[in-house]
């Protein structure tokens, strides 16, 4: 099922997202503590004439991990090479990437927790000693060839930090957990982006979109792009509050940022009446894979206190019952009459 609020777990930014991407910490809205710390570490590395230590970003998708990697490269005045762990199937794939890096380059690996143990073994000496160990042959006749690599900064990104092996995680000099964005931060992002798109939002419209964007910039920008279409076909020079509400309702995104998949998820838990349900049971009921449920659907519901994870499974919170139980039993849908 296609969802306007869904974010792919492994994806590089679209041309649309790239065109709106900030290029410096000054332009980047949100994640203030992370920006402040990175700014210090980058300035210190440049002052010493060294590469920045390896960096790990983790957190739900769409919060700006890729954007921060690009800003780091910009601030260090170096090139950035992009890849994703599922694309690195063999040690030779990683060797080809590493040997093509230039001195000081940034290597960005998305969903780094999906690297196989064999690939990790190749990566360890590259991260620690900037050296590539290639084994030729097998058994007693096997030989190891050592190839020196240029010094580089590895930036790993993941939505599943708990699945990163301890040896790999220990080799990162710094790690940062990205937080969900406030409505005010998203509203600013939307207003700036709307100007770049040539269809400016008024403040009320930007705030309305922000409230329904699941605290996630990528979703906010996706919603803005679609709302712009509603304004365009109505020959409106600016996106008004009423037009934003109309478009968001038409897209099936309610006032809390929930769509039909979220509501179906919550209905499953509410029908269980506080009886814990396992991830596999919920995924089967939604006809989704477990990874999508855990990485894409649940984080926002957890962060906002609508569900709870227990040792026995997931349950609907008291807040969920208070907020939705009556609405979910109505004949009228959650998306009607917003």
Curated annotation (Swiss-Prot):
Its EC number is 3.6.4.-. It holds the Pfam family AAA_lid_4. Residues 255-338 are annotated as: Head domain (RuvB-H). ATP binds at residues 20-21, 62, 65-67, 128-130, 171, 181, 218. It is found in: Cytoplasm. It is an enzyme of class 3 (hydrolase). The RuvA-RuvB-RuvC complex processes Holliday junction (HJ) DNA during genetic recombination and DNA repair, while the RuvA-RuvB complex plays an important role in the rescue of blocked DNA replication forks via replication fork reversal (RFR). RuvA specifically binds to HJ cruciform DNA, conferring on it an open structure. The RuvB hexamer acts as an ATP-dependent pump, pulling dsDNA into and through the RuvAB complex. RuvB forms 2 homohexamers on either side of HJ DNA bound by 1 or 2 RuvA tetramers; 4 subunits per hexamer contact DNA at a time. Has 3 domains, the large (RuvB-L) and small ATPase (RuvB-S) domains and the C-terminal head (RuvB-H) domain. The head domain binds DNA, while the ATPase domains jointly bind ATP, ADP or are empty depending on the state of the subunit in the translocation cycle. During a single DNA translocation step the structure of each domain remains the same, but their relative positions change. This is Holliday junction branch migration complex subunit RuvB. It comes from Campylobacter curvus (strain 525.92). The gene is ruvB.
């Amino acid at each position: 099922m296609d969802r306007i609020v869904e974010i792919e777990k492994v994806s590089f930014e679209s041309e649309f997202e790239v065109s709106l991407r900030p290029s410096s910490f000054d332009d980047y809205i949100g994640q203030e503590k992370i920006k402040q710390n990175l700014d210090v570490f980058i300035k210190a590395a440049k002052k010493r004439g060294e590469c920045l230590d390896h960096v790990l970003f983790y957190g739900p998708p769409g919060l700006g991990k890729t954007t921060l990697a690009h800003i780091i490269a910009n601030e260090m005045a170096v090139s950035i090479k992009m890849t994703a762990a599922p694309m690195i199937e063999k040690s030779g794939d990683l060797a080809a990437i590493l040997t093509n890096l230039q001195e000081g380059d940034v290597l960005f690996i998305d969903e780094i927790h999906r690297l196989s143990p064999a690939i990790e073994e190749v990566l360890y000496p590259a991260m620690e000693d900037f050296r590539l160990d290639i084994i030729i042959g097998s058994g007693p006749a096997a030989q190891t060839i050592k190839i020196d690599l240029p010094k580089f900064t590895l930036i790993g990104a993941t939505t599943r930090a708990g699945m990163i092996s301890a040896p790999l995680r220990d080799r990162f000099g710094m790690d940062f957990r990205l937080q969900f964005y406030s409505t005010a931060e998203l509203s600013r992002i939307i207003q700036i982006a709307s100007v770049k798109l040539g269809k400016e939002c008024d403040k009320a419209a930007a705030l309305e979109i922000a409230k329904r964007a699941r605290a996630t910039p990528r979703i906010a920008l996706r919603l803005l792009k679609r709302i712009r279409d509603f304004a365009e076909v109505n020959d409106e020079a600016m996106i008004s509050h009423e037009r934003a509400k109309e478009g968001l309702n038409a897209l099936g995104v309610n006032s809390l940022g929930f769509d039909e998949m979220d509501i179906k998820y919550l209905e499953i838990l509410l029908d269980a009446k506080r009886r814990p349900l396992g991830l596999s049971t919920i995924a089967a009921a939604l006809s989704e894979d477990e990874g999508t449920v855990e990485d894409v659907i649940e984080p926002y519901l957890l962060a906002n206190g609508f569900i709870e994870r227990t040792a026995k499974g997931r349950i609907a919170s008291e807040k969920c019952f208070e907020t939705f139980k009556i609405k979910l039993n109505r004949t009228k849908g959650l998306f009607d009459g917003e």
